[in-house]
Every structure is written in structure tokens, then in C-alpha cells.
Amino acid sequence: MVKLLVAKILCMVGMFFFMLLGSLLPVKIIEMDFEKAHRSKKILSLCNTFGGGVFLATCFNALLPAVREKLKEVLTLAHISTDYPLAETIMLLGFFMTVFLEQLVLTFRKERPAFIDLETFNASSDAGSDSEYESPFMGGPRGHALYAEPHGHSHGLSVQELSRSSPLRLLSLVFALSAHSVFEGLALGLQEEGEKVVSLFVGVAIHETLVAVALGINMARSAMALRDAAKLAVTVSAMIPLGISLGLGIDSAQGMPSSVASVLLQGLAGGTFLFVTFFEILAKELEEKSDRLLKVLFLVLGYTVLAGMVFIKW
């Protein structure tokens, strides 16, 4: 039990610094070199697809079985017997909640992008994409994306433009990313087995670090002051540790209410992972015409690695 607590605390510290460094390093050192940018895009795209496989294994091989097991305990204590797939229903409620949050944010932004994705690395509509519309989380300033072709254009808004035009828009974006991260942290904090904590941490670390890099590149592109960028980065980076802390608090409480809360929150967090996997990662990465088979290989590799880790007892 002590080892599990230590593992979760290390996850809190690790996630905070991974996201903080991912957000701030581009602001400090990145140079607007298009050749370098395109090379980085391929590497980041493969890492993102690998993370998609990690999330698939995390959701279906770790989270869903854990929710089913915990739910069975709760129903037994409450003397309730049912064959209804409650675990799957709770998880889908989390999925729909995440979709609603995305659409709520996009209503304020009045545009079409996905909730949080890495399309910042290829925000122009060109021959490399099957989609008529590109969807950056935050595009570059003056309508040009970081990785846009000379004649390309972006439908996104930069951090700088958002902060100038409407503080509410910038706050809505930070809120969306923060809420998203809190639920990922909750899933970590509520785990009761070491191998599930490790496998979940790997998936969250890969995805959230890449998202942090995307955010950092946009802040660098918009020439945001380092102090302002640091405030934004610290806010977003603190959300996963906050979620882990909430999960630890719920997990340490005894009794039926804490067990019910644990089941509900783990299920809702599982729905968030479903959204991340299919809407943010796979839908965006597999629509690109380049390196499709290589991406599928990395997707399967990510799943295989984490599915194998589920069998390891830590």
C-alpha cells in the first residue's frame, strides 16, 4: 500500500514537470525553421499514434475491468443484482460528457477544431490531409500555422490573438484542457493496483506531454511573454496532480459513498480516454496520407506494450 502511494506521488511530480517542460521549452528555445518543424512533426505524429495504442490498452485492458470489479463489489454491498452493463454505461456517460465539454468550448470559439489535438503541427489544408478542414488546438498568429505551407492558411486562433480579443475565449480553452487533465489524473489517483498505475501513467505521460509541446509551440509562435506563458503552463500542468490528489482522497475514505464515487469517477475518466483515443488521436493521425502503415504499426505496438504490462505485478 505504501509502494502504491509512493508511485502515485511520483506520478504527480513527474506529470507536473513533464507538462511544464513541454510547455515552456518551445517558448524559450524554439526557432521558426520549417525544415526542422516538418522533421519534428513526423516524430511527434508517431509518438502520438503510439500513445493512442497505449490508451486503447489502458481503457479496455485496465480501466474497464477495474470499473467492473469495483462496481460488482458496490452492488454486492448494496444487495443489488443486475445484468445491465453498468460499467460500460458509466464509461459512455464520461465520453458524452467530454464531447459536450468540447462542443461547449467550440461554441465560444465559433470554429470547428477537435478538443485537444496535435493538428497544430499541420494546420493548413493541403494535399497531405484527407480532411477539408484542419483543426488546430490553437493556430499560429496572423492566420498562419507553425507548419503551414507558404500558401496554406489556418482556421485557428493563437494564444496571443485570443488573449487580445477575448479573455473569455482563452479562459474557456484553459478550462477545457484543465478539466480534461483532471479526469486523467483522477483515473491515476483511483487505481488500486501498481501495474495499472504504471500502465496508465505511461499513456497519460505520452499524450499530455505531446499536448503540452503543442501548446508551448503555439505560445512560442505567438511571441507570448515568458512570464505569461509560465502562468498558463503552470495552471495546465497542475491539473493532473490535482486530479491524482482528488483520487487519493476519495480512495483513502472508507464506506459506501467513497466506493460509489470511485466507481463513477473511474468510469467517467474511462470515457475521457475513449474520446482522446478515437477523436483526438486516431481520427486526426490516420486521416493523414503520409506514413499510414507506420502509424498503424506504432498503434499496435503501443497497445501491445501496455497490454503486456497489465500482466506484470509490480
Swiss-Prot record:
Q: Which InterPro entries match?
A: ZIP
* Residues in compartment: Cytoplasmic: 25-42, 107-169, 218-229, 284-292
What main location does UniProt list? membrane
* Residue ranges that the UniProt entry lists as topological domain Extracellular: 1-3, 64-85, 191-196, 251-262, 314
Membrane-crossing segments per the record? 4-24, 43-63, 86-106, 170-190, 197-217, 230-250, 263-283, 293-313
Query: Where does the protein end up?
Result: Cell membrane; Apical cell membrane
Single Gene Ontology BP term? embryonic cranial skeleton morphogenesis
Query: Phosphoserine is carried by which residues?
Result: 125, 129
* Keyword terms, alphabetized: Cell membrane, Ion transport, Membrane, Phosphoprotein, Transmembrane, Transmembrane helix, Transport, Zinc, Zinc transport
This protein's membrane topology, according to the annotation, is:
Multi-pass membrane protein
Which Gene Ontology molecular function entries are recorded, alphabetically?
zinc ion transmembrane transporter activity
Catalysed reactions listed for this entry: Zn(2+)(in) = Zn(2+)(out)
Gene Ontology cellular-component terms for this entry are: apical plasma membrane; hippocampal mossy fiber to CA3 synapse; plasma membrane
Q: Which family does the record assign?
A: Belongs to the ZIP transporter (TC 2.A.5) family.
State its role: Transporter for the divalent cation Zn(2+). Mediates the influx of Zn(2+) into cells from extracellular space. Controls Zn(2+) accumulation into dentate gyrus granule cells in the hippocampus. Mediates Zn(2+) reuptake from the secreted milk within the alveolar lumen.
Record's protein name = Zinc transporter ZIP3
Which source organism? Bos taurus (Bovine)
> Gene encoding this polypeptide?
SLC39A3
